[in-house]
Amino acid sequence: MSEAEKKATIASGAEAAAPVAAQPPADSTAVVADASTIAVSTETAQEKAGKDETPAPIAAIAEPAASEAAAAPEESAPAAAAVVPKEPAAASEETKAPAAETAATPAPAAATSAAPEATKEKDAADAPAAAEKTGVAKLWEVCQAHEHKEIWGVTLQDPSSDVPTEIVLTKFLNANDGDVPKAVDQLTKTLDWRNKMKPLELLKKSFSRAKFGGLGYVTNHSEAADSKDPALKEVFTWNIYGNVKSMEETFGDLQQFIEWRVALMELALQELNIAGASAPHTITAENDPYKIYQVHDYKSISFLRQPASVKAASKETISVFSTVYPELLKEKFFVNVPVVMGFMYGLMKLFVAPKTLKKFHPMSDGGALAREFGGSKVKTLGDAMPKEYGGKGEELKATGKETMLD
C-alpha cells in the first residue's frame, strides 16, 4: 500500500469513530384539540399522575382556578453523546514494571489538577441558586419602586431577610419557569391590580346573601393544630354552584361577582398564612406547600343554554386569577359534573398553562372525592371531607368559612 493510500485509510477510520452530535428532541408540548365533549375520568388524580397524561379537558360554568400564569413547558436538554475508548493492548511482562514507574511520576500533577475540576463542579452547583437570588433581587427592585407594598396579606420587605416576601416573589419566578422579564411583568400587573382592587378591603365587605349565600366556603385541615410546618396543613376553597338560586342574579353583575370571588380567595390565603412563614419553611419550584385545593361542585346544574353572563363571568375570572394568583393551586376537582361539557375548556386553554391543566380532575361522582388525598401529609384528610364527598366530616355549612354576607 502506498503512503497516500495509508493516509486515506486512517482519515476514513477517524471520521467513522467521531461522536455524532446529539440532536435536540422534538417539541414535546402537548397539543390540546378543541373538543366540544369530554369523558369524565373515574381514575384518581394519583393514578392519572402515574400515567403522566394530561387529564381530559373539562368545562365549568364559572371560574375554574386560581391558577398559574401561562408558561412554556420545560424541555429536557439532550444527553451528550459519549465515546467509549478502546481498551489498551495488554502490556508484556517485561514492560509492565517500567510503565507503572512512569505512571507513578505524574501523580502529584493529577492531584493538583483535581482542585480546579472540583471548583468548576461547585460553581456549576451554585449557579442555579445564584440565578434564583438574582431573580428575586430583581423582583424586589420592582416592589421597592411600586406604590403598593402588599401581596396576599404579606407586607413586602427585603426578601434576603423576610421569608414571606421571599416566598411570594419566588412564586412569581416559578410561575414563569425562572424567566425574570416575564416574572417582572406579571408582578407589576399584580401590584397594579391589587392597588386598584384593594382585595383585603373586600374581606370586610358584605355581599348579598341571596346571591352568594352557601355558594363558597373555605376549610382548613391540620395534622397538628400547633405545627408551624405548612406541609401539615391543607386549605380548601369550595364553590357549590348547585346552590345558585338565579344564574342571572349571581353572575349578571360581573364586577360584583369578581369582587365576591376575590374575597373568597383572600379568605383562603388568610388560612394559608404565608405572612406567618419562617425559616426553614421556604419554597422551591419542586417543593412548595403553600398551595390550595379547590373543589367545584356542579350537582343539579344544567350545562345547556348557559346565559351569556355566566360565560362572561367565567372568562373574566380565569383571566384575572391566572395573572394575580400564580402558583397557588395545588389541585382542582370538578365534582358531580355531567359526562358531556363544552365551552369552558376552550377558555381555559387561552389563559392557563399546560402544566396547570394537569392539575384539573373532573369527576362524575362527588362521593369519591375523599379517596383523592392519600398522598397528603395530613393523614386524616380523607375522613375530614364532608359525608357527601365520601368522608366522615360535617357538612360545609357547619365547618366552612364564608365571606361576609348580609
Curated annotation (Swiss-Prot):
Membrane topology: Peripheral membrane protein
GO molecular function: metal ion binding; phosphatidylinositol transfer activity
Function as written in the Swiss-Prot or TrEMBL entry: Non-classical phosphatidylinositol (PtdIns) transfer protein (PITP), which exhibits PtdIns-binding/transfer activity in the absence of detectable PtdCho-binding/transfer activity. Regulates PtdIns(4,5)P2 homeostasis at the plasma membrane. Heme-binding protein that may play a role in organic oxidant-induced stress responses.
Lineage: Eukaryota, Fungi, Dikarya, Ascomycota, Pezizomycotina
Disordered, as annotated region: 1-130
CRAL-TRIO domain ranges (all copies): 216-397
Gene Ontology CC, one term: plasma membrane
Keyword Iron applies: yes
CDD domains: SEC14 (cd00170)
Keyword Ribosomal protein on entry: no
Compositionally biased intervals (Basic and acidic residues): 45-54
Location of the protein in the cell: Cytoplasm; Endoplasmic reticulum membrane; Microsome membrane
Organism, as annotated: Pyricularia oryzae (strain 70-15 / ATCC MYA-4617 / FGSC 8958) (Rice blast fungus)
Name of the protein: Phosphatidylinositol transfer protein SFH5
Catalytic activity: a 1,2-diacyl-sn-glycero-3-phospho-(1D-myo-inositol)(in) = a 1,2-diacyl-sn-glycero-3-phospho-(1D-myo-inositol)(out)
GO term, biological process aspect, one: regulation of exocytosis
Biased composition (Low complexity): 11-26, 55-117
InterPro entries named among the record's database cross-references: CRAL-TRIO_dom (IPR001251), CRAL-TRIO_dom_sf (IPR036865), CRAL/TRIO_N_dom (IPR011074), CRAL/TRIO_N_dom_sf (IPR036273), Sfh5 (IPR042938)
Pfam families named among the record's database cross-references: CRAL_TRIO, CRAL_TRIO_N
Gene behind the chain: SFH5
